[in-house]
Structures are given as C-alpha cells and as structure tokens.
C-alpha cells in the first residue's frame, strides 16, 4: 500500500488545488485530471485552452497503461481560394528571438475538449458537473497573476493585443498584466456550462464550431464545421523501452518525443553513460521524421504505430501528473503553440497556431497534408520496475528539449535513486546554438570541442520536469520543477 492517498505535481498552484479538491471529494486520478486540465484554461492561458491539444499517459490499475492522443489535426481542405489571414510575429525569449505566424490560417482543429470527454467516458468515476464545480468556482473569482504567468503573457503580448475582444482581459490601462494583477476570463464559467449541459458536442457541433467556420470563411482561415464534426481523439498503445533494469513507458506516434527519448537512452548506454556525447551523437544523426521512425523501428521492432505525419516540434507546453490512492495515475502534457491571436467570441478561449509553426509544417506554410494529425515533442513519461510496479511519473515543457531533460531526470531519480527533490535540482546539460549549455555544478563531461555556456541561475531553458516518484518502500515523493515555478502536493489520511 502507498503511504499516501494522492500525489500531484503541476505547473501552477491553482491547477494543483483544483486536482486536489477532486481527490479529496473521492474522485480518482482521471476525474482530477479533467478538472485540472480545464482549470489550466485560466491558470495557464498561454499553454492551454479549448483551442489546444495534447497527450496523456493513463495508467489504470485494472486496464494497464495507454496513451490518449488529443492533439491537433490539419484541416480537411488545404484549398487556397482565399487570401489567408496569416501574419508573422517575432517573440523574444531572452537568449533568442523566433518568428512565428498567427492568424486564422494558422489554426488547426483542436482536441482538448474531445480528449477530456474521451477520458471521462472511459475512466471517470464522478458526475461531470461535480468534476467541473471547483473549476467554475475559480472561473467566477479569477486569480492573481503569478511570476511564470507574467513572464509568459509578457512574451506573447503582441498576440494578445491582436484580438481587441480580449484587450480588457489581458491588459490593464493599456499595460499587459503583470505579477500580482487580478486575472479573470469573464465568459469562462458560461463556457463550462456549455460543456456541462451539451457535452463534447457543445463545442464541436454548436456555437464555437459555427463561429469559427464563419470567421474563417469571411476572413481567411481553413477550418470549417466539418473539421470539428470529424475530429476524434484516440487511444493508442504505448511504447515500452528497457533502460538499466527498468521499463520506460513512452508515448507512441504522433509523439516523436517518445521515439527521440528511446533512442537517446540507448545512445547514452552505448556512449559510456556520457550525456554530452549521447546528445551530440544523437543530434548529429539529424533525423527527419521518416528516418527517426525507421531508426526506432530497427532498434525496437514491432512497437511503432503507423502515422502519416511528418513534423516534430512544439513550444508553449505545460504538464501535470496525478496519482490517486487506488494506484491510478496520469501524466498529461498540452500546448496551444503561441496561440493564433483569435479568441472564440463569448468563450475567452484562444485557438492554437499549429499551422503557423515552421517546424510543424516542414513542407512549407499552407502545404501541409489535409486531415492529418500533427506530431509533437511532448513526452509524458512513466517508469515501471521489473515487477511491473509503477515507480515514476513525469513530463515537461520545453519544446524540442523535452525528451533530453526527462531522460536526465529519470537517470538521476530512478537509476541513481536520488531523492526527488535532489534529482530535480541536479544540474542538466544540452547542446544548442553550437555550444555546450550546462547548469552550474554539472559534474559530467562538458568537453566535445564546442564553446561553453554556463547557466548560473535556474532557467526554463532546461525544461520543467514535474514528477512523482514511488519508492521501493511505497513512500511517495512529488516535486514541481522550480525552473518553471512548478507546484506539488501529497495527501495523507
């Protein structure tokens, strides 16, 4: 028996509190996950929304471990018989600036709402109205902007400014919201009522879908009601990779992060357990999507799910983990991209800009394959021991760095058996911009003939690996990564 009745780690303290309230009411991990994900639309509006998508690893004590794919889908039609609303925007991340594209023609079909109802139908134990009750309470009162929210909203200020309908929400007297400012989505509670009374169809068949079709037809977007009507999230078999006496459970396609992490872990063992050499050699392969899938299938035959996608990147990600007293667990990662700058009227829900990220459409803008799942580096992860016991649950934000940071975290916490708090603070390493990037105190090899950049302060550059650890003696640890201002909680009888 576990020594606790629940454990949670998340990217925002209010997300955590919502999940905690459901578990205290007797709900299971999946009930809590639905509530937590919906709460993220308010607590982490730069990363989550009804207009977003994601992936979840779900471990059920009776039904095993499976992946829920509720990621975004390209529109059914790529016809260019209109002038697309598609404009570039430069986002300054501090150590780098990057160009993205927003507008109606950047929007892919979202999966978040459908995914939550798929999860509800399969594993929920509480009535839906009880699950969303604490989220509605939070929606009515709002919250104070925390430091990480302030950073994110500030980075994306120009995107929020592009839709006049939300100026009063994200700006205060013409200034973008800052830490400590009150934040509320005035229509969010009504939107939750729509889901409560009309379910999944309230979003995919009713007003939101009709409104998006109308604005796209009139102003230059690809999405139509048929895109929403045909969308479905799906359950997928997970990948299972042996690693130093444990089995690492990873998401299958379209999560290319799972393939990347599997091959990285194998390379790490082949390169004398040198993270820098493993990262360098793996990156030197410079796999495109097809080559990555072929390399994985050659190394781990018989596991890969067929897919017709060919992209491999995401920014703007967030993650949470929940484990309940029954032993059920979920690791869920979601993304909005940077956001399209279009908010569905009357909902305060921003649509994604997945078709505006160059890495997600390698063939070129407006040249994507219609009706196709986009791929992602999001990598919700679990680890089981040789007796098939769940021992570790984690995930991270951090775009293309996600599988590299999670791999190092698993090695520190699971293989080296460090206390989770110590493993969380264990310095990490990465290769970027032709330089070895490492945190102060990193004890491994840093020499590979490239320039060095030492990071003396914690930075979200090295991910945000929120995690839960189940020790051999059934004691449980939970930590939110301070690099992304994470939060964690463990409940006891």
Which functions belong to the PLM regions below?
Residues 235, 314-317, 376-378:
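Short, small/polar residue-rich loop motifs at catalytic or cofactor-binding pockets
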Residues 291, 295-298, 326, 372, ...:
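Extended C-terminal subregions enriched in glycine
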Residues 1-24, 29-199, 203-205, 209-244, ...:
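Noncatalytic scaffold domains of N-terminal-nucleophile
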Residues 42-49, 53-68, 222-224, 328-392, ...:
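Active-site rim segments in enzyme catalytic domains, especially the processed small/beta chain
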Residues 250-254, 259, 383-401, 413:
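Extended C-terminal regions of large enzymes
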Residues 263-335, 346-347, 452, 458:
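Internal maturation/activation junctions in enzymes
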Residues 204-230, 288-309, 326, 339-343:
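Amphipathic alpha-helical
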Residues 48-49, 53-60, 318-323, 331, ...:
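Short beta-strand scaffold segments in enzyme catalytic cores
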């Amino acid at each position: 028996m576990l020594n606790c009745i629940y454990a949670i780690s998340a990217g925002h303290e209010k997300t955590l509190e919502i999940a905690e309230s459901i578990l205290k009411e007797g709900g299971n991990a999946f009930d809590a996950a639905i509530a937590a994900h919906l709460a993220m639309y308010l607590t982490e509006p730069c990363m989550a929304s009804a207009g977003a998508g994601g992936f979840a690893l779900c471990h059920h004590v009776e039904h095993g471990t499976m992946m829920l794919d509720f990621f975004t889908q390209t529109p059914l039609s790529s016809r260019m018989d209109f002038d697309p609303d598609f404009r570039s925007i430069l986002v300054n991340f501090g150590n780098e600036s990057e160009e993205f594209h927003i507008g109606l023609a950047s929007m892919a079909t979202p999966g978040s709402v459908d995914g939550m109802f798929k999860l509800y139908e399969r594993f929920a134990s509480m009535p839906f109205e009880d699950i969303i009750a604490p989220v509605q309470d939070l929606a009515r009162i709002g919250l104070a902007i925390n430091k990480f929210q302030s950073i994110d909203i500030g980075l994306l200020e120009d995107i929020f400014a592009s839709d006049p309908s939300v100026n009063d929400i994200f700006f205060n007297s013409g200034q973008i919201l800052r830490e400590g400012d009150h934040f509320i989505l005035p229509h969010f509670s009504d939107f939750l009522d729509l889901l409560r009374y009309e379910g999944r169809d309230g979003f995919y068949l009713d007003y939101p879908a009709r409104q998006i079709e109308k604005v796209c037809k009139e102003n230059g977007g690809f999405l139509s009601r048929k895109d929403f009507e045909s969308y479905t999230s799906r359950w997928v078999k997970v990948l299972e990779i042996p690693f130093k006496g444990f089995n690492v459970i990873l998401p299958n396609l379209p999560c290319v992060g799972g393939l990347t992490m599997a091959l990285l872990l194998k390379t790490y063992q082949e390169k004398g357990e040198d993270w820098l050499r493993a990262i360098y050699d793996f990156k030197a392969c410079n796999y495109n999507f097809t080559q990555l899938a072929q390399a994985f299938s050659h190394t781990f035959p018989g596991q890969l799910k067929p897919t017709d996608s060919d992209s491999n990147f995401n920014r703007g990600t967030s993650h949470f983990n929940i484990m309940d007293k029954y032993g059920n667990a979920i690791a869920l990662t979601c993304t909005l991209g940077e956001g399209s700058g279009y908010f569905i009227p009357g909902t305060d829900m921003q649509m994604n800009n997945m078709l505006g990220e160059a890495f997600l459409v390698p063939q070129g803008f407006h040249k994507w394959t219609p009706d196709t799942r986009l791929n992602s580096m999001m990598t919700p992860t679990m680890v089981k021991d040789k007796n098939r016991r769940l021992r570790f649950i984690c995930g991270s934000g951090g775009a293309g760095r996600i599988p590299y940071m999670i791999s190092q975290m698993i090695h520190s916490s699971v293989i080296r058996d460090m206390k989770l708090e110590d493993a969380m603070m264990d310095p990490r390493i990465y290769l970027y911009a032709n330089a070895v990037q490492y945190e102060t105190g990193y004890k491994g090899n840093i020499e590979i003939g490239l320039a060095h950049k030492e990071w003396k302060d914690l930075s979200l550059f090295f991910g945000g690996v929120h995690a839960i650890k189940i020790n051999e003696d059934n004691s449980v640890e939970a930590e939110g990564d301070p690099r992304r201002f994470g939060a964690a909680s463990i409940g006891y009888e």
